[in-house]
Amino acid sequence: MAGEIAIGIDLGTTNSCVAIKDKVIENAEGARTTPSVVAFTSDGQTLVGAPAQRQAVTNAKNTIVASKRLIGRRFKDNVIKGIQKDYPYKIVEAKNGDAWIEAGGKSYSPSQVGANVLIKLKEAAETYTGKKVTKAVITVPAYFDDAQRTATKDAGRIAGLEVLRIINEPTAAALAYGLDKTATTKNIAVFDLGGGTFDVSILELGDGVFEVKATNGDTHLGGEDFDRMILNFLVEEFKKENGMDLKNDPLALQRLKEAAEKAKKELSSTQETDINLPYITADAAGPKHLNVKFTRAKLESLVSDLIDRTIEPCKKALKDSGLKREEINEVVLVGGMTRMPAVVKKVTEFFGKEPHKGVNPDEVVAIGAAIQANILAGGSDAQDIVLLDVTPLSLGIETLGGVFTKLIDRNTTIPTKRSQTFSTAEDNQSAVTIRVFQGERQMASDNKLLGQFSLGGIPPAPRGMPQIEVTFDIDANGIVHVSAKDKGTGKEQTVKIQASGGLTEEEIKKMVDEAASKADEDKKRRELVEAKNSAESLIHSTEKSLSEYGSKISSSDKQSIDDAISDLKSVLAKDDASLIKEKTDALSKVSMKLGEAMYKESQSASNDSSPKNDSTEEGERVVDPEYEEVKDEDSK
């Protein structure tokens, strides 16, 4: 494994980024970040990033944005109900009860959609290195639960990546920020407000150790919510002026969403902007236009409640870390939303100090992930760093009366392992069912059900006699594993949590195969496009040359070229790259006669315009020059 290339990926709600070591890699469009947008077109293409974003207005129902908000979630989750009305694409219930996406007549898991983004980033890294890339560290919001982390890891597998580690976004940011700052011990707070999620982590840095003391957050708070507040305001303004509700028009909504995001960004550096959308809709009287003057003050009033929501998690994280505000040495801002002046002001007020502004909030997470990837891959230049992260949520089981009994508390350093001994409730009971939950509420039903499993084959015995030791293990990815051992017989059983949702191994394998097949299709499609472009370019240049120099070649050569052009034109519509290349080569070959004629013509023109050295004009007197040889005195 030593010396292998491993990349770091920040798979974001709005934008994603890939890095190697400490360098951010540009994508195929030359941009350092890639929009987390995937579109399925009517002709079977899958577009990712900026190309998908550009066609969103005309293909809104098949253009998937913010799929990270769905990853690892159940369809009946209250969050999903809120999301459905915000996006034009359709969210459907999968067979296992998870929230999936319907587009182009097919259903896709959020992991599949995320995998498309990962593939694009992986390809960018392969183009940059000139080598195949198969290993990665992928970041997730610190407050992601087990199902969301597992689904993110599945996305990596579908994309053909071995996910070396899932790490928390604030931890990755701290790694990038503090790599050269561990000579002295310091406490830092990472405030991460991105496109769809919010996290805050308190860390202690020193002597090459990055130790997370506490983390908190909100997996449903981010830039998308800010955009929605602006969009709703614009809809209401238009309704007041025109009496029409734009929420029933998907095309208008997509244009409004893009305008809202653009205005939000502009108001980070200006006090006022114009939102101008001509022909936003029409009625019997004709087309309607939207033109609104939008100020920073108005924006801040619309989103003040959202900004305030970031403070409670900050308070909880500080409390759990055992530190006071004045003990925080540095505050690091991460995520595009931290460019908003009102957000910076709120953070400054809470922590009592100006945030550190020496990192790029859009890139720092990917860089941190890449640093960790280089360490895990055994890079020769990898620094000796110890990363101690925590589990964001408590892990436990449902006990008598539906009570949630915690086995592992939140903010416990991971990896970690805890064991608990269970027994039977009835005589001769041969099996017990254990339901595993993650969360902080007192009652199990109010927390997130990770799954349940049954321990069978228990020997007949009076109730309370069998001693079944169940071990709960959270790995370095924050993903939960369970094992069990019958202490009476010494027999050990491997128990796999049967999650209530999530992708099965068979589904993942199928999706991996589909992704590989899609990659082959995309390659063939690209080859076809390139072949057609070359053919059309050759036809154009040959026809142009033929019109200018056709008289300089024989009629039979001219006929051969005309025939070759006709042959090539006839196969352009057949979508057969090899046939198009064959006919292109044939035209290129027969048109060589035309090239020879063009060369002779240019040579003739060149000779006609050059000075005539071998003849003189009539009456011109030629005088031989007189000269004297000067000998070099030094050469004797």
From Swiss-Prot:
<feature type="compositionally biased region" description="Acidic residues">
    <location>
        <begin position="625"/>
        <end position="636"/>
    </location>
</feature>
<dbReference type="InterPro" id="IPR018181">
    <property type="entry name" value="Heat_shock_70_CS"/>
</dbReference>
<dbReference type="InterPro" id="IPR029047">
    <property type="entry name" value="HSP70_peptide-bd_sf"/>
</dbReference>
<dbReference type="GO" id="GO:0051082">
    <property type="term" value="F:unfolded protein binding"/>
</dbReference>
<feature type="modified residue" description="Phosphothreonine; by autocatalysis">
    <location>
        <position position="197"/>
    </location>
</feature>
<dbReference type="GO" id="GO:0005524">
    <property type="term" value="F:ATP binding"/>
</dbReference>
<dbReference type="InterPro" id="IPR029048">
    <property type="entry name" value="HSP70_C_sf"/>
</dbReference>
<dbReference type="GO" id="GO:0140662">
    <property type="term" value="F:ATP-dependent protein folding chaperone"/>
</dbReference>
<feature type="compositionally biased region" description="Basic and acidic residues">
    <location>
        <begin position="514"/>
        <end position="530"/>
    </location>
</feature>
<keyword id="KW-0143">Chaperone</keyword>
<keyword id="KW-0597">Phosphoprotein</keyword>
<keyword id="KW-0547">Nucleotide-binding</keyword>
<dbReference type="InterPro" id="IPR043129">
    <property type="entry name" value="ATPase_NBD"/>
</dbReference>
<dbReference type="InterPro" id="IPR012725">
    <property type="entry name" value="Chaperone_DnaK"/>
</dbReference>
<comment type="function">
    <text>Acts as a chaperone.</text>
</comment>
<keyword id="KW-0346">Stress response</keyword>
<comment type="similarity">
    <text>Belongs to the heat shock protein 70 family.</text>
</comment>
<feature type="region of interest" description="Disordered">
    <location>
        <begin position="514"/>
        <end position="542"/>
    </location>
</feature>
<dbReference type="Pfam" id="PF00012">
    <property type="entry name" value="HSP70"/>
</dbReference>
<feature type="region of interest" description="Disordered">
    <location>
        <begin position="598"/>
        <end position="636"/>
    </location>
</feature>
<keyword id="KW-0067">ATP-binding</keyword>
<feature type="compositionally biased region" description="Basic and acidic residues">
    <location>
        <begin position="614"/>
        <end position="624"/>
    </location>
</feature>
<feature type="compositionally biased region" description="Polar residues">
    <location>
        <begin position="601"/>
        <end position="613"/>
    </location>
</feature>
<protein>
    <recommendedName>
        <fullName>Chaperone protein DnaK</fullName>
    </recommendedName>
</protein>
<dbReference type="InterPro" id="IPR013126">
    <property type="entry name" value="Hsp_70_fam"/>
</dbReference>
